């Protein structure tokens, strides 16, 4: 196969590398720089990409495009797009709900999509690689932030196609950086590595375990709109405010012109402050031929960006929480991205991990391209290196995947941050009699109720046994390495089956929706817990009532129960079921009160039945007959025994059966007897012990006296 390259398509800078001769080479561009600005400029005569485009931005700001990565895969109405437009010197228009960049090129007004701008940067990276390798480059692995959604990933892949590249895979930037860190690490045992990737426009945190070439992502978090550009903008706003104080009569047009000329100077000042305590900014002829000159200290810069710096710790906390790993268990913190050179960022990370110093062994600007080059070699079939042959990448599902069960409850089968590929099965049953089929609805999200989550797809399984609780329906979720999910359902008795395939681009969430879901999950956590605690007693009462009703239909019960008792219990069950139908939104306390009322009628009748000495008929607790009193397998549950509850759960598709109060009360009644029996057995053993060890000794002593 032809050589494949790894490309880090960054917000502000891009980088390309290749793995060959058992080593990685980061390829310098025609200016001798190992990173290339992600800038594209349009003039009256030509199109410029990279360093040439950035160098003329002050003279041609309206036609020099940058930060396309902040627009790619987004809608024009996106609040972040709207906020960015205030800082962009070039014009963005709405075309079909998508942002389009408008420039003047060769005397004409042209429109370009973010994908097209990104493809131009990718073309530059491809040409850089071809000039170095002396041949054609067709295959590439392109990186994206871990928190990019499917729309953004697909748009990035489209940019690669426009650039004439066969994109072998889109991989996450922190995962690529982890490869760069771990490729030559041969430490024994499993190591927990946290990748802190703060670049020009995006921020990712990923926690991985690395062991013998296996790179397993445990959890990931981040912000696709936080990076060095935001720090630059704080400096720009600061200097513009200062400029306005000095020149109070400045017009909006002149202010806009000042804004266009200051970003490059502010970026330069920011870089200087990483190694110096103070720097100055000088812009020639900024206003009416007057030069603008001022200085800024590192302390002032840190104060301007303090809230942004501190916000980087929130994803770190979330990653550790999701992975259920204490910060003391993190072996290495790897800093990636140019913005991690800021001393305040390094100090915050170190302080968070109780003084542990971050690992700075890899170049933060090149680490992502380095790892992408390794992955490109693996995917292109390069088997010449032992180090690449031993690498295995395992990524994660960004959101929980599950089905809807009784009461509109979200029942996850695959939790968020589960390693993919993965396969998970659970067994469910039907919730009511004469149910000819079940509707299996697949959802994605973190909320307790399915109405608050995203529906991915649904299908029906028909031709199943009609008796409530009898069918055993095995639902299986199977997610492969490409994120394609197969959901199947099998009724074990009839062997009836059905399935659905859900792909990455079918009904998936946007980045905004993912962020909203996660934010809402935190915000409404208490509300979700309250709702779940309300539904539990509701379903417990419903299951209890229906199980009692089914038990009354059993012939043995019908024979042994007195007609008056049977009618009384039946009437109370009907009353409870009717109340449930009319009070679907009742409180937890009301459901518990109804359960107590039903128990007050049912328990004495149950006790009288047991006192008859007949034992439990089929379907009673511990028996295996059909129908059955609550708790028995005959009620549609697999025998799990005791108070642990059933193993096959009831659903509408399903809701878990709870241990039943009348069962518990019977057991509690016999507890003193069991305790007495245990004491009696202990006493007998004690007497035997004394007889065996002490009486023979006394007998022998009497013989010798």
Curated annotation (Swiss-Prot):
Biased composition (Gly residues): 624-644
Stretches the record annotates as Disordered: 624-645
Keyword Nucleotide-binding: yes
Pfam families given in the database record: HSP70
GO molecular function annotations of the record: ATP binding; ATP-dependent protein folding chaperone
Family statement: Belongs to the heat shock protein 70 family.
CDD domains (alphabetical): ASKHA_NBD_HSP70_HSPA1 (cd10233)
This protein's name: Heat shock 70 kDa protein
Keyword set includes Chaperone: yes
UniProt xrefs under SUPFAM superfamilies: Actin-like ATPase domain (SSF53067), Heat shock protein 70kD (HSP70), C-terminal subdomain (SSF100934), Heat shock protein 70kD (HSP70), peptide-binding domain (SSF100920)
Protein's organism: Ajellomyces capsulatus (Darling's disease fungus)
Keywords in alphabetical order: ATP-binding, Chaperone, Nucleotide-binding, Stress response
CC annotations in GO: cytoplasm; fungal-type cell wall
């Amino acid at each position: 196969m032809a050589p494949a390259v790894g490309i880090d398509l960054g917000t502000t800078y891009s980088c390309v590398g290749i793995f060959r001769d058992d080593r990685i080479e980061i390829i310098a561009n025609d200016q001798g720089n190992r990173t290339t600005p992600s800038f594209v400029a349009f003039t009256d005569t030509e199109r410029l990409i990279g360093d040439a485009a950035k160098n003329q931005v002050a003279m041609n700001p309206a036609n020099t495009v940058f930060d396309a990565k902040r627009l790619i895969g987004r809608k024009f109405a996106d609040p972040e797009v709207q906020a960015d437009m205030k800082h962009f010197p070039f014009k963005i228009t709405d075309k079909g709900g998508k942002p389009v960049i408008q420039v003047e090129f060769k005397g004409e007004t042209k429109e370009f999509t973010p994908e097209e701008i990104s493809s131009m940067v990718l073309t530059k990276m491809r040409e850089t690689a071809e000039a170095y390798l002396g041949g054609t480059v067709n295959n590439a692995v392109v990186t994206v932030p871990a928190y990019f959604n499917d729309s953004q990933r697909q748009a990035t892949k489209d940019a690669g196609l426009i650039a004439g590249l066969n994109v072998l895979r889109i991989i996450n930037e922190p995962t690529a950086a982890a490869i760069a860190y771990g490729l030559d690490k041969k430490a024994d045992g499993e190591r927990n590595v946290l990748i802190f990737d703060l670049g020009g426009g995006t921020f990712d945190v990923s926690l991985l375990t690395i062991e013998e070439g296996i790179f397993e992502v445990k959890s990931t978090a981040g912000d696709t709109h936080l990076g060095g550009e935001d720090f630059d903008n704080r400096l720009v706003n600061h200097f513009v405010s200062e400029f306005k104080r000095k020149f109070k009569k400045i017009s909006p047009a002149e202010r806009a012109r000042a804004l266009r000329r200051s970003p490059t100077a502010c970026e330069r000042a920011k870089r200087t402050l990483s190694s110096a305590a103070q720097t100055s900014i000088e812009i020639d002829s900024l206003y009416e031929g007057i030069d603008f000159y001022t200085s800024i200290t590192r302390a002032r810069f840190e104060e301007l960006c303090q809230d942004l710096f501190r916000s980087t710790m929130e994803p770190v906390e979330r990653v550790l929480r999701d992975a259920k790993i204490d910060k003391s268990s993190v072996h290495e913190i790897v800093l990636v991205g140019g913005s991690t050179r800021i001393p305040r960022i390094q100090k915050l990370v170190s302080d968070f991990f109780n003084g542990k110093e971050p690992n700075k062994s890899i170049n933060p600007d090149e680490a992502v391209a380095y790892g992408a080059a390794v992955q490109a070699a693996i995917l292109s079939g390069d088997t010449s290196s032992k180090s690449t042959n031993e690498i295995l990448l395992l990524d994660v599902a960004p959101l929980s995947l599950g089905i809807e069960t009784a009461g509109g409850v979200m029942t996850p089968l695959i939790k968020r941050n589960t390693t993919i590929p993965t396969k998970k099965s659970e067994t469910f049953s039907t919730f009511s009699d004469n149910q000819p089929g079940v509707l299996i609805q697949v959802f994605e999200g973190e909320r307790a109720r399915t109405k608050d989550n995203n529906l991915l797809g649904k299908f029906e399984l028909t031709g199943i046994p009609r008796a409530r609780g009898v069918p055993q329906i095995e639902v299986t979720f199977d997610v492969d390495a490409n994120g394609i999910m197969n959901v199947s359902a099998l009724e074990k008795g009839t062997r009836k089956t059905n399935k659905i395939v859900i792909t990455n681009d079918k009904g998936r969430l946007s980045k905004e929706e993912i962020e909203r879901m996660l934010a809402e999950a935190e915000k409404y956590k208490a509300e979700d817990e309250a709702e779940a605690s309300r539904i539990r007693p509701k379903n417990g009462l419903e299951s209890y009532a229906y199980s009692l009703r089914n038990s009354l239909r059993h012939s043995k019960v019908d024979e042994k129960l007195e007609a008056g008792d049977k009618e009384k219990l039946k009437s109370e069950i009907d009353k409870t079921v009717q109340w449930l139908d009319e009070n679907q939104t009742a409180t937890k306390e009301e459901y518990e009160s109804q359960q107590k009322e039903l128990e007050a009628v049912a328990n004495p009748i149950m006790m009288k039945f047991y006192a008859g000495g007949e034992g439990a008929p089929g379907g009673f607790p511990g028996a295996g007959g059909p129908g059955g009193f609550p708790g028995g397998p005959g009620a549609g549950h697999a025998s799990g025994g005791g108070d642990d509850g059933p193993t096959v759960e009831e659903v509408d598709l399903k809701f878990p059966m709870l241990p039943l109060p009348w069962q518990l009360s019977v057991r509690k009644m016999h507890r003193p007897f069991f305790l007495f029996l245990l004491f009696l057995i202990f006493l007998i053993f004690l007497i035997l012990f004394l007889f065996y060890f002490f009486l023979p000794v006394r007998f022998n002593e009497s013989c010798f006296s």
